[in-house]
Amino acid sequence: MSEIPAKTLKRRGALSREFLSGDGIEVGALHHPLALGPHARVRYVDRYDIEGLRWHYPELGGYDLVPVDVVDDGETLSTFRDGELDFLIANHFLEHTENPIGTIRNHLRAVRQGGRLYFAVPNKHDSFDRARPRTPFEHLVADDRDGPGRSRADHYREWVRLIEKRVEPAEVEARVDFLMSINYSIHFHVWDARSFGDFLDRPRTYLDNAFDIEHLSANGAEIVAILKKRDPASPRPRLWIPVKVDKLRRFLSTHGADWKGRARTMRAALGGATRASTGRRAS
């Protein structure tokens, strides 16, 4: 696993201080927990305890890992009650989930009305995923509807061929069988700035407008999104125009790290068609 640049970590911390407060969790923090402000308290959740993580990720042998306070599946969070949390952090986690839409649904369940989800995913163009195709939204819907087992082996084959660069069919299948047998955590899904913006917009309707997109920006080689859980009785959320997201991608690449206070510039970049939040203090 590569090191995260200090500038990226600094920007993450600034966003967390702006948006996150109260009691929350971070899923899969490993050796890079999110820096939080003084009004936020966090517990760390992972699918293995420290010993299990050390076995599963031998490449992290030289790093200090955060303590695992709760052992749970970060996709389902079955140990957490509905509305128990003020916030949930999952950096570089969604791409590892087999059912990202179902994961967002479960994460929303675990936070209170007005609670926030803080996500970061790698931009495929700036990562080892650059040779892989973007995951279509229709594929994600099928994984949610039919279960991720339908596509699991195909994801591992793509990983073995395009990331591990194995080409012999017998070798590929043997490697796929091994990785699946140990439930190795690959990047099941791939996004860039354009497709991730579209991915967040379309599930809003698919999930009955359960959240607002409060923040979306480029942050070095990653894309950061902050979602706010809506009260079902509140007015419909602000529009987010996916057909303009190619312009949004160019805007983010130029202005992403300084989005707050640029609403007028952003509306111009998007042709005046959208009203996206420029950020609010945590409440």
List each model region and its residues.
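Hydrophobic adenine-recognition pocket in adenosine-nucleotide-binding enzymes
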Residues: 93-94, 121
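Class I SAM-dependent methyltransferase SAM/SAH-binding core
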Residues: 22-77
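S-adenosyl-L-methionine-dependent methyltransferase catalytic module, highlighting the catalytic core
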Residues: 71, 102-108, 113-253, 257-261
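Hydrophobic beta-strand segment of the Class I
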Residues: 88-89
